[in-house]
């Protein structure tokens, strides 16, 4: 069921919403992993939000990658992302005032990138 918009709260829109989502995802990653990405870009297209993060690896993870342990780092990143799922969804729902129906995460080692994808419940049509 689609959330009802709450007009009493000023919610960010447009570029401000994109920036707010990027900031909250970076902050959550920093709190949970000890270091946040150095770059983040959020794109919103109707019911899909994609956050692309750059330079995400901690120094410990980079040390392991440099010694051919990329798979172990990717496994650990998947565990972090699964553990952060609830917090990420709650943050995006609070910022957009919409329900997240699906959340997906992926990481890439070289180049050092991550993507967080949020699928939103479609907005209810405006009353006529």
Identify the meaning behind each predicted range.
Residues 1-128:
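Interaction-mediating elements
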């Amino acid at each position: 069921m689609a959330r009802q918009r709450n007009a009493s709260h000023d919610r960010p829109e447009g570029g401000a919403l994109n920036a707010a989502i990027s900031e909250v995802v970076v902050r959550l990653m920093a709190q949970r992993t000890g270091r946040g990405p150095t770059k983040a870009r959020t794109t919103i297209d109707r019911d899909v939000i994609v956050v692309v993060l750059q330079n995400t690896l901690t120094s410990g993870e980079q040390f392991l990658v440099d010694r051919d342990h990329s798979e172990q780092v990717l496994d650990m990143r998947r565990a972090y992302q699964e553990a952060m799922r609830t917090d990420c969804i709650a943050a995006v729902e609070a910022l957009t005032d919409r329900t997240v129906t699906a959340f997906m995460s992926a990481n890439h080692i070289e180049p050092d990138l991550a993507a967080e994808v949020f699928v939103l419940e479609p907005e209810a049509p405006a009353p006529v």
